[in-house]
């Protein structure tokens, strides 16, 4: 029977008569490394049979000199190792480094493996299937098991395309893997096991794990380190869950659908010990895997407090990357302050995805009201905590006009930090990918090389792919390309600050909507030869290449040896310009705008404004510790207090955010590491003022 999930499920499984193997009763919450090792050694003493060799893979990309530990595999292994009945299973090192040259070595190591366990994600599917295929060729008897988010629930022709895979694991893998190994030791009738698919059948889903404290920690048992070899020059990233589940059902995401709405938590005692483990083992980066950190406000505050204490005591962890609760409020500010006070947190995410009501209804998402959102960004700004928001282009229900309207609304929030805008990815198990949903909204997608920002080109020898949406009933491909152009302009010229205050000036003085300002910039970039137009040429090629399925990678080795998003690369090219050249380029565009809109601003005002805009940017030319500049007009008063333009010979100064002398490191610090922390510009309200002449004269534009 093929893909029984799409038809009737197996009904003949009699759960009442199912045989269960008795195992040792253990208090996993009190497990330490020493008694875990004693337990394993005791299990080994009971062996009087041949070992079963288990190999595994959880491939990841490197980010700088960092790579993720194989957390998912370690969860399974640490659990299995506590079961006496599985003492004959010998777990080999997990393959994590992705390199085509290493594949043959991995295959050779698996020539005599009995089981291959593969943790599958969108960023490692191709290399994982290549590994499994090659191992099947040299080791036909190996049981190959795939699990992870990339394992599809809707199988279609999966086993025809990947005949070398024996078992697919759906959902949480701990209990399912235990049952697979139990059956492996017996008659190997996998039909008895819930939550799996083979080429012949799919069984009913496995119930969710209710008691997480029955699962030992892969960190406290040191399992996660036992599964890897340390490599000189590399540091480990630790994935970390404090809870599992998501109460939301956004259709573009597989989080809520894959873990259901029930939220389940690990004990605070275990989490605090894991935080201490991170510090003891000098783990620099914690990749938080919660869908909604902060949803348990008091509990999560104590977790944040413990992380802060650990960093102050031991210097590690250095960074905690976390997905914040979708419906945030000022109540999470104390959590964020604990983390930002010691540099653990770079910025708080306040995601919107879309501001269009019809789109939000279509994707089953509810946002904060925008005035509430805006008040929240102001509260964070008052506490000196950076914020950023995320938008998705091309969601079902969105139109070009609604997308532009949403951007106009977001730009009205002057306290919001960065704006990050992404294509709409189509995940295999997200509700958006269900056949009935795709048909209802006329969703078309393409397979394209995966866009993994800040990864090295030399890791792309085995190309990974993703699916992105390129058309729905609410927009066509041409309109989506236009959305991308506006997304790039807003991120490059507004968020990175190249033209931000110029746009606000024209909005204040001429009531020119900011999106109309950027529409004019688009016309200028398309028709006028300038340094700006060179970036627009990059943009057009990038858009055509991306939406034809050839990928979104953008490499400029004058900037960095990594894949930069186009908006980061464009901003970097502007910010490293000689400031006189940048002044001239902005001046040319302003002249074009004035002529196009028939504005007649005074040249002295415009020159001083452009000078002020550039002064606020983190430019490569100026690496001094303190930046200072004299101006004819009081621009701080104008932008911060909405005052009239007044002449006042004034000098502003501020501490330079980036003074790195190495040109490549400078770019990384400004547009990569510094993007969410707003390291690329200074806000007018934070300027220090040294008044030379307190003689203000209200100055008219005309």
Annotate each predicted stretch with a short phrase.
Residues 2-59, 64, 86-88, 109, ...:
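Radical SAM enzyme core and accessory elements
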Residues 5, 18, 23, 28-53, ...:
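N-terminal [4Fe-4S]-dependent radical SAM core
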Residues 42, 218-382, 393:
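Radical SAM [4Fe-4S] cluster-binding motif and immediate context
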Residues 62-74:
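Glycine- and acidic-residue-enriched helix-capping/strand-helix junction motifs
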Residues 75-89:
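Short helix-loop-beta junction
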Residues 80, 134-135, 307, 380, ...:
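Hydrophobic positions in alpha-helices of CheY-like receiver
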Residues 89-209:
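Glycine-rich beta-alpha loop elements in corrinoid/cobalamin-binding modules
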Residues 115-117, 279-289, 315, 319-323, ...:
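Conserved C-terminal portion of the radical SAM core fold
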């Amino acid at each position: 029977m093929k893909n029984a999930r799409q038809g009737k499920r197996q009904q003949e499984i009699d759960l009442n008569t199912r045989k269960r193997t008795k195992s040792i009763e253990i208090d996993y919450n009190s497990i330490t490394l020493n008694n875990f090792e004693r337990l394993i050694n005791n299990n080994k003493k009971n062996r009087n049979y041949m070992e079963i060799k288990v190999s595994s893979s959880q491939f990841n990309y490197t980010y700088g000199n960092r790579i993720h530990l194989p957390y998912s595999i370690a969860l399974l292994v640490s659990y299995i190792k506590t079961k006496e009945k599985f003492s004959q299973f010998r777990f080999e090192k997990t393959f994590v480094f992705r390199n085509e040259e290493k594949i043959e070595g991995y295959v050779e190591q698996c020539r005599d493996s009995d089981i291959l366990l593969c943790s599958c994600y969108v960023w490692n599917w191709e290399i994982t299937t290549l590994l499994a295929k090659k191992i099947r060729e040299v080791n036909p008897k190996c049981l190959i098991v795939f699990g992870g988010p990339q394992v599809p629930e809707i199988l279609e022709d999966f086993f025809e395309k990947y005949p070398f895979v024996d078992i697919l694991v759906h959902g949480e893998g701990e209990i399912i893997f235990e049952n697979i190994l139990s059956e492996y030791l017996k008659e190997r009738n996998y039909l008895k096991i819930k939550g799996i698919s083979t080429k012949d059948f799919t069984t009913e889903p496995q119930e969710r794990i209710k008691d997480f404290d029955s699962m030992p920690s892969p960190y406290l048992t040191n399992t996660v380190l036992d599964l890897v070899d340390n490599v000189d020059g590399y540091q480990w990233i630790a994935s970390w869950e404090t809870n599992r589940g998501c109460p939301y059902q956004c259709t573009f995401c597989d989080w809520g659908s894959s873990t259901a709405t029930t939220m389940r938590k690990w004990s605070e005692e275990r989490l605090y010990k894991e935080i201490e483990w991170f510090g003891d083992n000098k783990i620099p980066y914690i990749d938080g895997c919660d869908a909604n950190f902060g949803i348990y406000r008091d509990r999560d505050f104590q977790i944040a407090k413990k992380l802060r204490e650990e960093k102050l005591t031991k210097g590690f962890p250095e960074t905690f990357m976390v997905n914040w609760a979708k419906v945030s409020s000022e109540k999470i500010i104390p959590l964020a302050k604990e983390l930002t006070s010691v540099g653990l947190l770079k910025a708080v995410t306040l995601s919107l995805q879309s501001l269009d009501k019809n789109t939000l209804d279509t994707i089953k998402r509810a946002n904060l009201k925008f005035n509430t959102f805006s008040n929240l960004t102001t509260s964070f700004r008052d506490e000196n905590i950076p914020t950023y928001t995320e938008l998705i282009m091309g969601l079902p229900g969105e139109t070009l006009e609604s997308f532009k309207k949403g951007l106009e609304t977001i730009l009205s929030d002057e306290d919001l930090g960065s704006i990050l805008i992404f294509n709409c990815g189509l995940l295999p198990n997200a509700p958006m990918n269900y056949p009935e949903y795709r048909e209802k909204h006329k969703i078309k997608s393409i397979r394209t090389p995966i866009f993994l920002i800040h990864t090295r080109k030399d890791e792309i020898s085995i190309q990974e792919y993703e699916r992105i949406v390129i058309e729905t009933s609410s927009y066509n491909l041409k309109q989506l390309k236009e959305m991308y152009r506006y997304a790039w302009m807003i991120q490059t010229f507004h968020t990175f600050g190249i033209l931000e205050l110029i746009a606000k000036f024209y909005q204040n003085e001429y009531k020119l909507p900011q999106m109309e300002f950027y529409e004019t910039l688009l016309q200028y970039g398309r028709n006028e030869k300038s340094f700006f137009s060179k970036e627009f040429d990059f943009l057009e090629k990038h858009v055509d290449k991306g939406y034809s399925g050839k990928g979104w990678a953008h490499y400029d080795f004058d900037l960095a040896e990594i894949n930069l998003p186009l908006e980061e690369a464009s901003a970097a090219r502007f910010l490293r310009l000689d400031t006189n050249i940048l002044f001239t380029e902005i001046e040319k565009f302003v002249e074009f705008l004035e002529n196009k809109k028939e504005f007649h601003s005074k040249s002295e005002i415009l020159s001083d404004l452009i000078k002020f805009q550039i002064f606020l940017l983190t430019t490569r030319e100026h690496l001094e510790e303190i930046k200072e500049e004299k101006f004819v007009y009081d621009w701080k008063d104008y932008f911060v207090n909405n005052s009239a333009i007044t002449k006042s010979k004034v000098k502003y100064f501020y501490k330079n955010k980036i003074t790195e002398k190495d040109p490549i490191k400078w770019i990384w610090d400004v547009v990569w590491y510094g993007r969410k922390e707003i390291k690329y510009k200074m806000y007018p309200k934070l300027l220090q003022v040294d008044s030379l002449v307190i003689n203000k004269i209200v100055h008219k534009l005309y």
